Amino acid sequence: MTMNFVTFNQDYSYLAVATSKGFRIFTTDPFAKSYETKDGNIAIIEMLFSTSLVALILSPRRLQITNTKRQSTICELTFPTTVLAVKLNRKRLVIVLEDQIYLYDIQTMKLLYTIETSPNPNALCALSPSSENCYLAYPLPQKAAPSSFNPPAHAPPGNTHVSPTSGEVLIFDTLKLEAINVIEAHRSPLACITLNSDGTLIATASDKGTIIRVFSVPDGHKLYQFRRGSIPSRIFSMSFNTTSTLLCVSSSTETIHLFKLSQPSQLQETSSANTSSTGRRRSLSSLSQSPEREATEEDNGSSDLASRKHNGTLMGMLRRTSQNVGGAFAAKVGGYLPKGVSEMWEPARDFAWIKIPKPNQGQGPNANTGPLRSVVAMSSNTPQVMVVTSDGNFYVFSIDLSKGGEGTLTKQYSVLESNDRLGYSVADY
């Protein structure tokens, strides 16, 4: 049996594991198996909070919504190409294909909207767990340049979008069904994005993996900038804790970094200051527009924002909202130094870190010679970090929130063991 996919639910109280022989669901605190089926080769699994509703990808193009309590199928959907990711909250179901995103009303399973995207083979996409701030984030689609070559009439249509060359994030309101902002997060293409539980913060990382940035949502103010390291690394997973005071990041270095975010009161002050400065810039930008241009943009709305050219006035105005730097120190330094120099002062280092235990090389069904992939989350009840690795291990580490430093391994389990005793406490040994 091999592990195909692993994920936490929206509040990290459950862990879902898709395998070549069915799927398993565990509670995380205490760690215990709560449901198991041994049928089917499950490619992807997603839970809806702590409910019995589970979304499964049974074959590359087929989605099944299942009620585990009643052991019944609610509905099945088939898509034109391979399903790469599934996202859920209490309002929306999001299906990510390589060049499309489908939005459904989760109550009625009615298709609400289809988004055309740039090629997205890694299914970069984040859906807020919040029903109020119900935002979707994904890489900004980049239009293909017009071609002088006219294909024959019988030829299939070519790609309208190309792979992104920069790390811009589009914020889409899934309730209003319109794009509302573009955040210029990185110069390099994105590698990982995640939203917090309230839908008010987004963390981003590029394919270089050295700098992690946090922006406010939906306005796109840059609030924090963290340095993971100086050597490029692939970011596998990022997760806020439930109170949005910590950000946890895992990468191919097999070290997990924890970054501290300001307290809510400090965050509010920083956001207010940024909002004031942004308002001034928007007013200046508006003055430079002709009445015809301004009216046209108001009439078009923002639902077609993703398809606009990069040099559009509205797009430029939206982008500028992401350039504000949070923090009094950065604001003062930025006034005296060029942007490229001042940003060298900004990134904060981690306050705590975790080293993932080395697995036994070449052993187990999920053994491989590549980097150990990991998914991270933080417990909502205790200062603990939960880590699931691609070799099927589940670790729990304790963190000293006051002193920081290296986390301590306290528990270790296997999510692939078939017996009832799925693990042990490190304290027992």
UniProtKB/Swiss-Prot annotation:
Topology term for the membrane: Peripheral membrane protein
**Protein's GO biological process:** autophagy of mitochondrion; glycophagy; nucleophagy; pexophagy; protein localization to phagophore assembly site; protein transport
Q: Which UniProt keywords apply?
A: Autophagy, Endosome, Membrane, Protein transport, Repeat, Transport, Vacuole, WD repeat
GO CC entries:
cytosol; endosome membrane; fungal-type vacuole membrane; phagophore assembly site membrane
Ligase listed as a keyword: no
- Give the residue interval(s) assigned to the motif L/FRRG motif: 226-230
Q: Which domain of life is it from?
A: Eukaryota
Kindly indicate whether the keyword Nucleotide-binding belongs to this entry. no
Subcellular location(s) of the protein: Preautophagosomal structure membrane; Vacuole membrane; Endosome membrane
GO molecular function ontology, one term from the record = phosphatidylinositol-3-phosphate binding
Q: Where is the signal peptide?
A: none
* InterPro entries with a match to the protein in the record: PROPPIN (IPR048720), WD40/YVTN_repeat-like_dom_sf (IPR015943), WD40_repeat_dom_sf (IPR036322), WD40_rpt (IPR001680)
Q: Where is this region: Disordered?
A: 267-309
Q: Enumerate the WD repeat regions by residue range.
A: 1-36, 69-114, 139-182, 185-225, 230-269, 309-355, 367-407
Q: Which family does it belong to?
A: Belongs to the WD repeat PROPPIN family.
Q: Which PANTHER family match?
A: WD-REPEAT PROTEIN INTERACTING WITH PHOSPHOINOSIDES WIPI -RELATED (PTHR11227)
The Swiss-Prot or TrEMBL note on domains reads: The N-terminus might form a beta-propeller domain involved in specific binding to phosphatidylinositol 3,5-bisphosphate (PIP2), leading to the association of the protein to the membrane.
Its quaternary organisation is: Component of the PI(3,5)P2 regulatory complex.
| Known function | The PI(3,5)P2 regulatory complex regulates both the synthesis and turnover of phosphatidylinositol 3,5-bisphosphate (PtdIns(3,5)P2). Necessary for proper vacuole morphology. Plays an important role in osmotically-induced vacuole fragmentation. Required for cytoplasm to vacuole transport (Cvt) vesicle formation, pexophagy and starvation-induced autophagy. Involved in correct ATG9 trafficking to the pre-autophagosomal structure. Might also be involved in premeiotic DNA replication.
In Swiss-Prot or TrEMBL terms, this protein is called Autophagy-related protein 18
